[in-house]
């Protein structure tokens, strides 16, 4: 996502589609810090900030304006083409959304074959992650170290874990799509500023949010995927 922001701001105009409203807000804030609020727009299903002379549009993928003819266009997490609920939107963007001078699709290697078949002239770039992961074994939630994110797979589960952490650790932030934009943003800021050392969230935070997390824990090994309960898979 950092690379996409750099490329967009290198052009006179640009549009970027992101999978989460919270991520769109994060990218919007970064672009405003670099270019100022008078030229950056934010469009999601909940927020709409469009200055009269907007040059850069930061949006959720569903809310992307595809008719403005921007010099640059990017779609993040393009592997969501395979998602049962949102896949049709990402597939439409893959097939039809283009920048006048540059188009960038970011996502997992699982899309390499599809993109090569549909866009044979596309250039593939790999960006290595700088962080490393190591398995720390199972732990009780009350034993989690500071700067931990605990991922739950239902609203009830998230609230129950948050209450347990508040009782045992003194405080935590809660991030879910069901919260209002203002509340979500405030909760992320609470954690990022170090006011609390624990974050409890749904698994949506895995789609590109840049958080200062040293440890990640899952509340279980099964989740409801919209149709059935299933095991988590890598």
Could you describe each region identified by the protein language model?
Residues 35-46, 125, 169-181:
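Conserved RecA-like helicase motor-core motifs
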Residues 79-134:
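Post-DEXD/H (motif II) to motif III coupling segment of the RecA-like Helicase ATP-binding lobe
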